Amino acid sequence: MAKKSMVVKSSKKQKFPVREYTRCERCGRPHSVYRKFKLCRICFRELAYKGQIPGVRKASW
């Protein structure tokens, strides 16, 4: 889990757009966040396995 202070800090409007970065909306993790879903890889995997993300299914080939 991310520090609450860092989550609040990243949610504020930055003076320069370069300083903005994505965070997982579920846990607040700053790295490995999928922009389309706004989730980190760990939360994405959990929700995908549960079937809570529409249109996402496990790949098999």
Curated annotation (Swiss-Prot):
Single GO molecular function: structural constituent of ribosome
Any one GO BP annotation for this protein: translation
Organism of derivation: Staphylococcus carnosus (strain TM300)
Protein name (database record): Small ribosomal subunit protein uS14
Cofactor note: Binds 1 zinc ion per subunit.
Record-level GO cellular component terms: small ribosomal subunit
Keywords associated with the record: Metal-binding, Ribonucleoprotein, Ribosomal protein, RNA-binding, rRNA-binding, Zinc
Binding positions for Zn(2+) per the UniProt entry: 24, 27, 40, 43
UniProt record similarity statement: Belongs to the universal ribosomal protein uS14 family. Zinc-binding uS14 subfamily.
UniProt key word Metal-binding: yes
Gene3D superfamilies noted in UniProt: 30s Ribosomal Protein S14, Chain N
PANTHER family cross-referenced by the UniProt entry: 30S RIBOSOMAL PROTEIN S14 (PTHR19836), SMALL RIBOSOMAL SUBUNIT PROTEIN US14B (PTHR19836:SF26)
